[in-house]
């Protein structure tokens, strides 16, 4: 089954201010896929949030992948901007929504292309 996964910055602050911020996130994403090979169909990075369409082989794979991705991104972002100890980057745990119909999957894929 495919899932729509998303997360936002705390109080909808900006996660990605400049192109280097997007590139840094994508480097973490490449590392995450190398560590936990989660099939990703599409993703979309917005200034204050992101969306993914994925098809995990297990529920554990989904949780492990996005936990590692958000934790690592947060740590590296704080290190880069010297904001360690200033609080959370994300509003909380990522959200997941199962896509049980082809129409739902197609709609989210169009949104995240």
Give a label for each model feature.
Residues 1-113:
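Short catalytic/metal-binding and nucleic-acid-binding patches
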